[in-house]
Every structure is written in C-alpha cells, then in structure tokens.
Amino acid sequence: MGYLIEIAFTVLLLTALSDGQLQGSSCTMKNTGRAGVCTPFANCQSAKDASYKGNLPQKCDLIDDDSELVCCVAATCSPLLEGLVNQLPIGSRAADYCIELAQKIHPCQETDSGWTRGNICHNLTPESNIEYKRTPMATMAEAPHYGRFGQGQIGAISWANYPVNLVSDQWVVCSAWAIGSIQVLFVGLGGTFEPKYTPDETYGVTERRIHPLYNGSYSVYYNDIALLRLDRRVTFTTRILPACLHTGTPLPDSGFIQSDSAGLKTTMQRPSQEECSNLFTNHHGHPDGVLNDMEICSLPVNTTGECAGWYQGSPLTLPNSLRVACTHLLVGYKSYYIGSPCAVINTRISKFIPWIEDIVWPVSGGVVV
C-alpha cells in the first residue's frame, strides 16, 4: 500500500512540474523571441534592468527554493559603477540606493541597432564655467535633486526661499532651522527659476522628522537636519532626480559646488579647521565651536561675491567627476553663514547617515522596506 502511495505521489509531482519550468530550464521571451534561462530574479541582470524601467520581468511558472524565477537573457550591456562599488561602504543602504539609482538612470534596453544603456541625464554645464563666479542655473535640471517647500493651498502656494534636497523617491532632506515651527504643506521639485520659481511637480508633505538632538529653541545650529516625507512616490525625469548621499569618504579641499535658492551656483573651497574655528569664535549658534564631525566649513573661491541669498538648505555637492551617473553627491547643505567673508557652516551629511537610513530605507526582517 505504501509503495502505491509513493508511486501516486511521484506521478502527482511530475504532473505539477510539467505545468511549469524549473530553474535552469529553457524559456523564450514573449516580446522579443529571444532565448533565455529560468533564473532567480536576484541573479538576473536583464530582469533587474527591466524592473528599473518599470517593466515587469517575464516569470517562469515555478518558484524554486522560495526564489522567484524569471526568464533571463544574457547580459547585453556593459556593467555600471565598477569603480564606485569598490569605493562604497559595504552594507550602506544609502550607497546601495545610489547604485540602484544609477541603474534606473541608465537602464539596459534593446533598440533596433542592438542593446544599449538609456540616459535621462541633463547635459550639465561644464564646471570650468563656474570656477570663479556665481552663474545661474537655467532650470532645475542642473541640480535635479533641488526643490523648495511651500505653504498655503493648491492654486495659491507660497514657495519659501529655503531649498530642500531629494534623496529618495519619497523623502527630502532640509535644514531643521529652516522649517522650524512652520507648517510645511508642499514640496516643489523640478521646474525653472525665472521669472519666479515654478516647479514641474508639487507634492504634499505627510510627515516631518526633525533630528532628536536638534535644539532650535535656543538658536543652536548643531544637528540641523530634518526629513520630509512626500505624499506619493516621485517619478524621475531629467529635471527631477535624487542626490546620492556622501557616506564619509575623504573630501577634497576645494571644488565643492554651492547652489542657492535663487538658482545660482558657485565653487567653494574648504578652509582649515583652525581658520574655520577662528571665523566662528564666540558665535551664539555654536557655543562649543565648529564641530568638525557634524559640520563642514566652506568659503567661496571668489570671496567678494554676494552671499546674502544663500538660504539654509542650499546644497553643497561634489563636482561632476565624482558624481554617480548624472546625480549630484550631496556632501551637506548650508546651516549658517557670516556675511564677511561669506563663510558658510554646512551640515555634514555623512554624520547623519545612520539616522537618515533608518527613516528613508528602514529594515524589517533583514530586508529594506
């Protein structure tokens, strides 16, 4: 009797398997007719590239070892970010997101002439044009992470001068001092500056998280960082892309690009810690002096430039050569400045990576959710 049951079970199993495809079995892509192999999604670059473009990968019928099997064609595009991957800290959720973002910006796609990587990047202004002067950004495409927060109501939004910086598809980072007790209702992304700020997209704000150690009631600027959650996920375009976050690798002494709320940009340099401390001696906002682990001091290369328009939240980024794809690498943003010689104290992003990651890319059951 036991023998008959075993035979019946085997027949049933073979019948079930015949209705699907096992890992390693052949498959055919329905849309292109290309031959593939049933492979776990996590091991299939072509399926990942399809998902980055918003396309559902073609599934094989069976689930093997709890891994979703997809019809996987051979990798046909050159790999991205090989050098960057070696520089990024292992296990950093911010760094992992940066790599994922680059795949979305340059998806592997099939064309009539073969396979190539797409590109939604804007043609960035050569940095040689902004070495010693402040020059305007024609559109937000030159700083696609850049936006502003607003108050009021739809159709009559008042946009503040204080910038915000997009860091994922649903969160922006900004100065805690800037939002203070203001009821921030909207965030604008993309758009143009002239004749007035006009965003491409407007988002509601559903949550605000101010760093627990920020003490704005006493006008002390330490831990000047906040996060705002948007009411829906952002669709990335040429003019709307998150910035990658600087995670703590060594910084150069010059070449930072500072953008301000009027759509102007300039090249900044980093003074010595001693010089920075001397500039902010006895400053009421820094009773313990400039704290190098959480702040970055910067000066414009052209120290005669006007700096009154640099509002809290103005991003401090690294130059094109150190960017991932066409994203900016956000090192910090303006927290405070003194008018002469336009010395700026910037919140240092790398100090707050653990706090940011736990909010923007939380982990549940060992998986980023």
What residue ranges belong to the model's regions?
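C-terminal subregion of chymotrypsin/trypsin-like serine protease catalytic domains
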Residues: 2-4, 21, 32, 41, ...
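Conserved H-D interstitial segment of serine endopeptidase catalytic domains
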Residues: 147-152, 172-175, 179-215, 272-281, ...
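N-terminal activation segment of mature serine protease catalytic domains
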Residues: 106, 110-156
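Cleavable N-terminal signal peptides of Sec/SRP-targeted secreted and luminal proteins
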Residues: 3-20, 187
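Chymotrypsin/trypsin-fold serine protease catalytic domain
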Residues: 225, 230-231, 236-303
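Classical protein tyrosine phosphatase
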Residues: 2-6, 156-190, 246-259, 324
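Short, solvent-exposed loop/turn segments that connect beta-strands within catalytic domains
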Residues: 155-158, 195-198, 217-220, 285, ...
